[in-house]
Curated annotation (Swiss-Prot):
Coiled coil: none annotated. It is found in: Cell inner membrane. This is Probable riboflavin import permease protein RfuC. It comes from Treponema pallidum (strain Nichols). The lineage of its organism: Bacteria, Pseudomonadati, Spirochaetota, Spirochaetia, Spirochaetales. Belongs to the binding-protein-dependent transport system permease family.
Length: 377
């Protein structure tokens, strides 16, 4: 319950901060607020883009949540998504003549492998040298981004004249026009199935149980004989592979190409998403629609209402600042104070005679028993 309260307060305050920024930075606040809150649902194209972004947010949040469940924090999401998208664009820009499904599967496997290897380096350094995975993953991501930028601009630039993107993906590999059950975009459907598989892995498999135990209590994991070092490595590999899946779906689903800097901010958005959900897989999918709505609404406000500030950044900042606050602490202090006042009143008014003393002891024992029971429940 405390986690739910903290998450709800962080989200509400983040939305309030974004609304305040829109009012302060816009020349016409009413038009900007209307564009922010209503325009994402105004047309079918906006709704379709919202569903596509929700699928990407599910994959991103799964990557961040898998790292959190194993006791790690993967800050290299931007670089891992970027590398996977770049590899996908290179492998799918032309048809090889071996079957579309086979080529699509090879590109997917390569994208997952590249991102998983980048994350695996941080896991190995954590397991063998006890280095911080946050620092190593962030540094590797920071090193990969300018390297891929240079490759896109020089070697793999679109020969048709686009200076900031690779050649577009072959039309047969694009998921943008593909739909699945009830008209839901294919990206969101595939991402939901992946979320279901990851949730079953952590909840109903022996290896997933070991991952969760070693992530929460590594000393206990070592005591019972679990390979904690393997948890670090494979947890980061799984996190990187899911970030790579995000890059793959970004190229074949939403963008159709790999352009310079398309993954900027995705890693931190995924971390904010996972922190709000407290790494609960079942919460990630519905929460993805909220984050997709926020990003779509911010773009609509910037384009339609001439807003010069990307307010999604303020949402992420508010979440990072507020998610760690213990908002239930004041309520617990009030409960403790009320309990002390109750004990004082019982002591004052039940002091005369053996009958009153017995009644006082009984009242205090019943109150303490109820408090202990409610505390454990």
């Amino acid at each position: 319950m405390k986690r739910v309260i903290n998450s709800c307060i962080a989200v509400l305050l983040g939305v309030a901060v974004m609304s305040a920024v829109i009012v302060l930075c816009s020349e016409n606040p009413s038009v900007s607020l209307a564009a922010f809150f209503l325009k994402p649902f105004s047309t079918r194209g906006y709704i379709r883009a919202l569903f596509h972004k929700a699928g990407l947010f599910v994959c991103m949040a799964l990557g961040a949540s898998c790292a959190l469940k194993t006791g790690m924090i993967n800050l290299g999401g931007d670089g891992q998504i970027y590398a996977a998208g770049f590899v996908t664009a290179l492998l799918l820009r032309e048809y090889w003549g071996v079957g579309f499904l086979l080529q699509w599967s090879v590109a997917l496997l390569c994208a997952l492998s590249v991102a998983g290897i980048l994350a695996c380096v941080s896991g190995i350094l954590k397991a063998w040298l006890a280095t911080s995975e946050m620092i190593t993953s962030f540094l590797l991501s920071t090193a990969c981004v300018p390297l891929i930028d240079a490759l896109i601009i020089t070697v793999t630039r679109d020969p048709a004249g686009n200076l900031l993107a690779t050649a577009p993906v072959h039309s047969h590999f694009i998921l943008q026009q593909q739909t699945s059950l009830f008209g839901v975009p294919a990206v969101l459907t595939y991402a939901s199935l992946v979320a279901l598989a990851v949730g079953c892995f952590f909840s109903y498999t022996r290896v997933g149980y070991q991952f969760r135990i070693c992530g929460k209590a590594p000393e206990f994991g070592r005591f019972v004989g679990f390979p904690v070092w393997a948890t670090y490595v494979w947890g980061m590999v799984l996190s990187g592979a899911l970030f790579g899946l995000t890059g793959f779906f970004s190229v074949v689903g939403l963008f159709g190409t790999c352009y310079v800097g398309f993954s900027v901010g995705m890693g931190y958005a995924a971390l904010a998403h996972a922190l709000i959900a407290h790494a609960h897989i079942t919460v990630l999918v519905p929460l993805a629609f909220f984050f997709a709505w926020m990003e779509t609404a911010s773009e609509a406000a910037v384009l339609g209402a001439h807003l010069t500030v990307n307010v999604v950044l303020f949402l992420q900042a508010a979440i990072f600042l507020l998610i760690s606050a213990q908002w239930s602490a004041p309520w617990n202090a009030v409960r403790r104070g009320a309990r002390r006042v109750y004990r004082f009143l019982v002591t004052v008014f039940c002091f005369r005679g053996e009958k009153h003393r017995t009644r006082r002891r009984h009242a205090l024992s019943v109150h303490d028993t109820h408090h202990r029971r409610s505390r454990w429940e």
